[in-house]
Curated annotation (Swiss-Prot):
Its main location: cytoplasm. Residues 1-32 are annotated as: Disordered. NCBIfam families: PRK14140.1, PRK14149.1. Residues 1-17 have a biased composition (Basic and acidic residues). The gene is grpE. This is Protein GrpE. GO terms for biological process: protein folding. Participates actively in the response to hyperosmotic and heat shock by preventing the aggregation of stress-denatured proteins, in association with DnaK and GrpE. It is the nucleotide exchange factor for DnaK and may function as a thermosensor. Unfolded proteins bind initially to DnaJ; upon interaction with the DnaJ-bound protein, DnaK hydrolyzes its bound ATP, resulting in the formation of a stable complex. GrpE releases ADP from DnaK; ATP binding to DnaK triggers the release of the substrate protein, thus completing the reaction cycle. Homodimer. Belongs to the GrpE family. GO terms for molecular function: adenyl-nucleotide exchange factor activity; protein homodimerization activity; protein-folding chaperone binding; unfolded protein binding.
Length: 186
C-alpha cells in the first residue's frame, strides 16, 4: 500500500511537474508572443517613419528636378540677352544718324538706306523677342528712367516730354529703360 501511495505520490508529482512545465511553456510562449508583438509594432512604426521620410525626400527631389528644369528653360530663353545688350549702341547710332539728317537730306539715298537698315534691324530684333519700349504720355518707372525735368506748358506734371534714348525689352524683361525727360510745372 505504501508502494501504491508512493506511486500515486510520484505520479501526482510528475503530473504537477508536467503541468508546471506546460504552464511555464505557455507563459514563455505568451511572453515570447508579447515580445514578438512589441518587435512587430516597433518595426511597423519604424517602417512608417522611413516610408514618410522616403515620401518627403521623393517630393523634395521632384521639386528640385522641376526647379532645375525651369531654371534651365529660363537660362536658354534669356541666353541671347547679352548679345541684345551689345546691339543696343548700334541701334542708337543708327537712330542718331537718321535724326541728324537735315530736312533736305530726307530724300537722299543715305537717309533711305538708313531707314531700310533700321527697319530690317527692328524686324530681326522683333523676331528674336527684342522690342522698343513705348514712350507715350505716362511715365512708368518700370520702363522709363527720368534723366531731367523740364518746364512744359503742353504737358502735365510727370508726363514724358522727350525721349532722350530709346529703351528696349527682351521677351518682356527690360534690357534698358528708356531715358526720358518729364514735365515739371510749378
Amino acid at each position: 500500500m505504501k508502494d501504491e501511495h508512493n506511486q500515486e505520490h510520484d505520479l501526482s508529482q510528475k503530473e504537477l511537474e508536467s503541468c508546471e512545465n506546460s504552464c511555464t511553456c505557455e507563459g514563455k510562449k505568451q511572453e515570447a508572443s508579447e515580445k514578438e508583438c512589441e518587435i512587430k509594432e516597433d518595426f511597423e512604426l519604424k517602417y512608417q517613419e522611413m516610408h514618410e521620410k522616403y515620401l518627403r525626400v521623393h517630393a523634395d527631389f521632384e521639386n528640385v528636378k522641376k526647379r532645375l528644369e525651369r531654371d534651365k528653360s529660363m537660362a536658354l530663353e534669356y541666353a541671347y540677352e547679352k548679345i541684345a545688350l551689345d546691339l543696343l549702341p548700334v541701334i542708337d547710332a543708327l537712330l542718331g544718324a537718321h535724326k541728324s539728317a537735315s530736312g533736305d537730306d530726307k530724300e537722299s539715298a543715305l537717309t533711305k538706306g538708313l531707314e531700310l537698315t533700321m527697319e530690317k534691324l527692328h524686324e530681326v530684333l522683333a523676331r528674336h523677342g527684342i522690342e522698343g519700349i513705348e514712350c507715350l504720355e505716362e511715365f512708368d518707372p518700370n520702363f522709363h528712367n527720368a534723366i531731367m525735368q523740364v518746364k512744359s506748358e503742353e504737358k502735365e506734371n510727370g508726363k514724358i516730354v522727350q525721349v532722350l534714348q530709346q529703351g528696349y525689352k527682351y521677351k518682356g524683361r527690360v534690357l534698358r529703360p528708356a531715358m526720358v525727360s518729364i514735365a515739371k510745372n510749378d
